[in-house]
């Protein structure tokens, strides 16, 4: 990666982080839930998935700013998967990105709810993108497929149900 590419990566990463900061800021009775969502969503990370979306949008002639809602949606979906993956009933991790996991900070119930809420919020973010309705629908469908039984949930199932057993390439792919 050249210095120009790195500078561009950092600039896009900063835009994505700034956009993510605007979500879940309301003062409401569910403040602890929002805190759990923001804690995990804003805990750092490379933002590779949203960065790729922004770059693909630009390469295909789209506008970087118009891609940010969908980019945030992808990061929300990714964060939901990490929260759930860390739960005691899954991988039972205590740390994520060098910090206590969501369930360690906010309890298991709030972590499950934070993950569920981030998954739903991901679709809201994608569907709020200022693009043609067909394109927005296609993005939401792609996101849903990525999360469903053939995507992340299916992968998590294989991870938990086959733990300690040999897994062949065909069943994973």
Language-model regions: role of each:
Residues 2-24:
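N-terminal amphipathic/basic leader segments beginning at the initiator methionine
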């Amino acid at each position: 990666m050249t210095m120009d590419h790195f500078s561009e990566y950092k600039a896009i990463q900063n835009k994505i982080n700034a956009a993510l900061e605007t979500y879940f800021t309301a003062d409401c009775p569910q403040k602890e839930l929002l805190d759990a969502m923001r804690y995990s969503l804003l805990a750092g990370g490379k933002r590779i998935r949203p960065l790729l979306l922004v770059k693909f949008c630009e390469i295909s002639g789209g506008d970087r700013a118009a891609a940010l809602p969908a980019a945030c949606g992808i990061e929300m979906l990714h964060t939901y998967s990490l929260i759930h993956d860390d739960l005691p009933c899954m991988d039972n991790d205590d740390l994520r990105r060098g910090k206590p996991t969501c369930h360690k900070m906010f309890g298991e119930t709030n972590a499950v709810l934070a993950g569920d809420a981030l998954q739903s919020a991901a679709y809201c973010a994608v569907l709020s993108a200022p693009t043609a309705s067909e394109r927005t629908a296609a993005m939401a469908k792609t996101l849903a497929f990525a999360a469903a039984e053939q995507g992340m949930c299916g992968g998590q199932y294989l991870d938990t149900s086959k733990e300690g057993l040999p897994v062949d390439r065909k069943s994973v792919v």
